[in-house]
Every structure is written in structure tokens, then in C-alpha cells.
Regions:
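Conserved glycine-rich cofactor-binding loop
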Residues: 21-22
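Conserved glycine-rich Rossmann-like NAD(P)H-binding loop of the short-chain dehydrogenase/reductase
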Residues: 35-51
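Rossmann-fold cofactor-recognition segment
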Residues: 55-70
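Substrate-binding pocket helix/loop in short-chain dehydrogenase/reductase
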Residues: 100-113
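Active-site helix of classical SDR
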Residues: 124, 160
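Residue(s) in the substrate-gating loop at a strand-loop-helix junction
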Residues: 144
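C-terminal helical subdomain
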Residues: 184, 200-235
């Protein structure tokens, strides 16, 4: 069942991706540009943003820190001034460092909150007035299967991704009646600079290009939650529905932690 308007045609759509200097964000920006979208990329890495703009004619690069509220607002104003509207906004900025309770680091916890969750709130603050005024558009937040239930090494990361899932669900309830689409992306393991920090063999690891294709397919199907690769994510989705005792036993057995 389609929960959002299906997006099959990207030509001329103004798409803003925050966190697009590498990994999933960069791969998605490239594929959207190839499909004719007017792509705006933002990230802290100014050199990467400039490189994308110079190599993708018609695109716009705006370097910013996702944790800078004023910069996010100014970027949205710049996009509207240049393009007249924002049709699609994707928040894919992220921070990840493995953490367990025995090595609790409050500063690192708050860094995860700032980048992964509060940055998304800053994007909403910048684009929601535009989308509501337009009575059209789409918001998409990149969460993770780590947001489904607690996982070892995900003490800092997992709660921020769970918050994004809840945020997207609530946004959908509020914005769908206004004609605005909302989706949440829940990837498994994708080969990015963030997952490179893991010291274990990641099951069902995929490349960012495959992740981007899955996302575009999900938007084309009008899905609310887009999760992949399904050979891995379906298992974790099923585990959301088992009792706590069984869940903890299964996770300990398969992770060894």
C-alpha cells in the first residue's frame, strides 16, 4: 500500500540533501542528478561540496554544519531565492562511534544527539514553513535499523535513530493531510566512513550506490519506511515483535556481546 505520493519523475524537482559529502548522501545526490533533479548538497566538508557542484552541472553546493541552526535557515532561504521552492529535503547527516556502558562518554553521547537528531530538527525548522506554504513536497530522514531496538555498541547511536523513527511517524500524521510526504530510511550495514569504524564483520554489507537505488525505489513506491537490504532488515523487523527476554537472548547469541 502506498502511504505517500509516488515519486517516479525527478526532472526539475528541487532536492536538498543535508549530509551529502560521502556515503549514502553522496550516492543519492549523484543518482538524483542523473535523473534530472536540481540537486542541492550540503555538508561540513566544503571541498567535497564544491567538487560536487563543479562536476554536476545545474547543482548547488552549500557548505554548512548541520548543528548550526542559523546556517540551516540561511541555506533554505538561499535555495528558495534561487530555485523558487523546495520539493524534497533529505536529512542524511550522521555521526557514529561504537560505545558500551562500560566506556560511557557523555560528550560523545551529546555529539550523537546533536548531529543525528537535533540537526534534523534544524532542517525541519528551515523547510517546514516552505513546504506548508507550498502545500506540497516531501521530507525524508535517514535513521537506521539500530533504531528498532537496543543493540550492543550502539549506546550513543541507537537512541538517536529511534528518535528519528518516532519523529518521522509523528510528522507523517501531521503532514500527510496537508499534502506533504514523509518517509524514514532504515538501512542495515552500508560501507561508509562511519561503518568503517566497526571492528566486526558486518552482515549483509552493501555499497552506498545500492542503498541509494533502494531509497529511490522506495520513494517511487510511495513507501513510508524504506529498509534495506531486506535479507537482513526483515530479521530485525521481526525481532521488534518478540518479548524482551527472547530478544536479549537472540542478540547475545548472534553478536557474542
Amino acid at each position: 500500500m502506498s502511504l505517500n505520493p509516488r515519486i517516479n519523475e525527478w526532472t526539475g524537482r528541487v532536492v536538498w540533501l543535508v549530509g551529502a559529502s560521502s556515503g549514502i548522501g553522496l550516492a543519492t545526490a549523484r543518482q538524483l542528478h542523473d535523473r534530472g533533479a536540481t540537486v542541492v548538497v550540503s555538508a561540513r566538508n566544503a571541498a567535497a561540496v564544491e567538487a560536487f557542484e563543479s562536476s554536476h552541472p545545474g547543482s548547488l553546493g552549500i557548505a554548512l554544519d548541520a548543528t548550526d541552526r542559523d546556517a540551516m535557515k540561511q541555506a533554505a532561504e538561499r535555495i528558495v531565492a534561487r530555485c523558487g521552492r523546495i520539493d524534497f529535503a533529505l536529512y542524511c547527516a550522521g555521526h557514529y562511534a561504537p560505545m558500551r556502558a562500560s566506556s560511557y562518554d557523555l560528550d560523545e553521547m551529546l555529539r550523537h544527539e546533536s548531529v543525528n537528531y537535533v540537526g534534523a530538527l534544524y532542517l525541519l525548522d528551515a523547510v517546514l514553513p516552505v513546504l506548508i506554504r507550498q502545500k506540497s513536497g516531501h521530507l525524508s530522514l535517514v535513521s537506521s535499523v539500530a533504531g528498532y531496538r537496543g543493540l550492543p555498541n550502539s549506546l550513543a547511536y541507537g537512541p538517536t535513530k529511534a528518535a528519528l523513527i518516532n519523529l518521522a511517524q509523528t510528522l507523517y500524521l501531521d503532514l500527510h493531510p496537508l499534502g506533504i510526504g514523509v518517509s524514514v530510511i532504515c538501512p542495515g550495514f552500508v560501507a561508509t566512513p562511519l561503518t568503517a569504524r566497526n571492528e566486526f564483520k558486518m552482515p549483509a554489507l552493501i555499497q552506498p550506490e545500492e542503498a541509494a537505488r533502494e531509497m529511490l525505489a522506495g520513494w517511487a513506491a510511495g513507501r513510508f519506511e524504506i529498509h534495506f537490504p531486506k535479507r537482513f532488515t526483515r530479521v530485525l523487523k521481526a525481532l521488534r515483535h518478540v518479548g524482551d527476554g527472547l530478544y536479549f537472548r537472540v542478540i547475545r547469541r548472534f553478536t557474542g556481546l
